[in-house]
Amino acid sequence: MTDTRRRVKVYTLNEDRQWDDRGTGHVSSGYVERLKGMSLLVRAESDGSLLLESKINPNTAYQKQQDTLIVWSEAENYDLALSFQEKAGCDEIWEKICQVQGKDPSVDITQDLVDESEEERFDDMSSPGLELPSCELSRLEEIAELVASSLPSPLRREKLALALENEGYIKKLLELFHVCEDLENIEGLHHLYEIIKGIFLLNRTALFEVMFSEECIMDVIGCLEYDPTLSQPRKHREFLTKTAKFKEVIPISDPELKQKIHQTYRVQYIQDMVLPTPSVFEENMLSTLHSFIFFNKVEIVGMLQEDEKFLTDLFAQLTDEATDEEKRQELVNFLKEFCAFSQTLQPQNRDAFFKTLSNMGILPALEVILGMDDTQVRSAATDIFSYLVEYNPSMVREFVMQEAQQNDDDILLINLIIEHMICDTDPELGGAVQLMGLLRTLVDPENMLATANKTEKTEFLGFFYKHCMHVLTAPLLANTTEDKPSKDDFQTAQLLALVLELLTFCVEHHTYHIKNYIINKDILRRVLVLMASKHAFLALCALRFKRKIIGLKDEFYNRYIMKSFLFEPVVKAFLNNGSRYNLMNSAIIEMFEFIRVEDIKSLTAHVIENYWKALEDVDYVQTFKGLKLRFEQQRERQDNPKLDSMRSILRNHRYRRDARTLEDEEEMWFNTDEDDMEDGEAVVSPSDKTKNDDDIMDPISKFMERKKLKESEEKEVLLKTNLSGRQSPSFKLSLSSGTKTNLTSQSSATSLPGSPGSPGSPGSPGSPGSVPKSTSQTAAITTKGGLVGLVDYPDDDEDDDEDEDKEDTLPVSKKAKFES
């Protein structure tokens, strides 16, 4: 079907009382067997699919609005609308609906909107039509009472609306308004306020078209200035005529479009500023007013898009060097308002809108505008850019990659955005925060497209790290040339925090691009300089950046961290924080706890070998002692690979397997008695029977002897130690300024009687520094007392020692056979 008269858009009203566009198609009417009646059918013009199939129900209230709209409710809270391209098509379908319902096509509504009680309906139907009082000054109070009394009843509202419409009553009321103002009749003006407000609540399109006409709308606004609850009238008309003057920056040749823009602005002003807040009214009382504004906006955007001369002139003047600054500012502000206007459109309409702007060259125009000195113009251009990025980031990426082939890095659009972020003069960096959000959207791989021939992620990130990343990190590198930030004022700290936030996002999402950049440019070392900042939020941003890197558990990063000794700034910050329980203390402990729990072997060894002296006295959490235990276990396995192999056998391979298999093997083990042993040998898997018994049993015997000795020492320590609760980290530690690994600590707290002193050789029997059992038992008893460290995971400690504990749970007969 190619008849444009029947071309329509289908809309549904969502939960937020906004209209959603369901598609464009052609409407027809006909009998549908499945629905058993005449129905409205809309088929999509793109593929012929069925957009709407709605039976014309004899009892459904259909409304005709603005000559080209038909609105109705299918069910509770499900409103539909057909917006016709031409009035003739709307009239044809309206006649068909009225024919089915047996109504006169001259009416604008076919049924009462809300059912009433039978008694009330009978009374109203038996009474004659509503008779309005004569429109005179002396009867304004009576008219106001009539309007107020009609609002609760839908049928009375309908009768009142018809009477007002048929008698041209609104224009008569507005004539009285002029008389009251001339006579300064305040009482009469107060009555007119109540009358006009009540007419809005009638929710009638035909009345709105009269009230919002060019000759009436300012008088309607005038009536609404005289709110009886206010001591002085508002000056809405003065604002609209003097302050909010319409500036036609580009001549609009279409008078209908110009009138529609004026009308929409004023009606929007009435809705937002003049009428009381919507919460005062019953739900849906102003739904027709919302619809009136919405469809006006759709129409305006469509008319502007179709006016190619208007848009061509707009962009030509924007980029013309001869355009004076005041004119350019007006043009940019108009374009900004135009884009803001489009946000009310549905996705399909917005798609066409931004595609039109793109074809007209909006991005090159923005690039020119952003390079100008006028801060107001640049600010408006930034807002326009944000609309484009939010709606279609791929379009922006494609543009910046294409221009990189022709222009230097300094004048690339994305680099201009970064420079404006860095150079934001606002003390609160409001503009910088907005721009950082836009950059984050542009570099987010989640909204990048992938096709068979090319991947936008690979291409754009390659471009970004080659042409733009050095601009983003410039303030960071400039401020971290020494051991502490060269500038540490609040605004600089805020800016660097924004840069770090974006870099942290890149670490999480960009894999090898950011990895190569960090390692090649030594970025992490520079970032950790900021841990010496006096601003805690900046130091925490730097720590968060490192924590994100460690969280990846990437050995390339780990080797870089160890090679450059990049735990030193963190340990320094931890020690300088002293005994304060704050976010810095918790965040640092959490980072080391992550290394322990995840058993990152390389970092565990690096931390203990280089920083144990500084951390060994931290006993209010078990994190660092747990790290030391991990380290000793690693070294023990390295020194005794055969012991490690045997232990894995005794642990039943330690790692979690199928639960049923595990239970069967445990049952076999514990059901085995001495008769199952041959010549005092342990039962091992057949693959291990070929091993030399002495090679296996000798280290086991030594291990059991050391274990017994440790347990006896630990019992003595526990008996002497006061387990009254968690100790406060009231230690005083100093840092020497020698080599990077020369971190020393000194405890100001007196050692507990019998507590371990400085650690000796971890591998020697009975070494005071090797007390894993004491550590875990102390932690367990403290937990029973109800006090737990800031970042303390006793369950993890139990898991670490679980396998050693299993040996103690073996039957006595089996222990004897191992020790014999």
From Swiss-Prot:
Stored Gene3D superfamilies: Leucine-rich Repeat Variant (1.25.10.10), Pleckstrin-homology domain (PH domain)/Phosphotyrosine-binding domain (PTB) (2.30.29.30)
Domain of life from the UniProt record: Eukaryota
Family: Belongs to the SMEK family.
Annotated positions of the Phosphoserine modification: S117, S127, S685, S728, S755, S758, S761, S764, S767
Residues bearing the modification N6-acetyllysine: K642
Keywords: Acetylation, Cytoplasm, Cytoskeleton, Nucleus, Phosphoprotein
A molecular-function term among this protein's GO annotations: protein phosphatase regulator activity
Record field: compositional bias (Acidic residues): 670-681, 793-807
UniProt GO BP: gluconeogenesis; positive regulation of gluconeogenesis
InterPro entries (alphabetical): ARM-like, ARM-type_fold, EVH1_PP4R3, P4R3-like_central_dom, PH-like_dom_sf, PP4R3-like
Functional note: Regulatory subunit of serine/threonine-protein phosphatase 4. May regulate the activity of PPP4C at centrosomal microtubule organizing centers. The PPP4C-PPP4R2-PPP4R3A PP4 complex specifically dephosphorylates H2AX phosphorylated on 'Ser-140' (gamma-H2AX) generated during DNA replication and required for DNA DSB repair.
Protein name, as recorded: Serine/threonine-protein phosphatase 4 regulatory subunit 3A
Region (Disordered): 670-699, 720-820
Residues covered by the WH1 domain: 1-100
Comp. bias (Polar residues): 721-752, 772-781
Pfam families in UniProt: EVH1_PP4R3, PP4R3
One GO cellular component term: protein phosphatase 4 complex
Subcellular compartments: Cytoplasm; Cytoplasm, Cytoskeleton, Microtubule organizing center, Centrosome; Nucleus
Subunit text: Serine/threonine-protein phosphatase 4 (PP4) occurs in different assemblies of the catalytic and one or more regulatory subunits. Component of the PP4 complex PPP4C-PPP4R2-PPP4R3A. Interacts with PPP4C; the interaction requires PPP4R2.
Source organism: Mus musculus (Mouse)
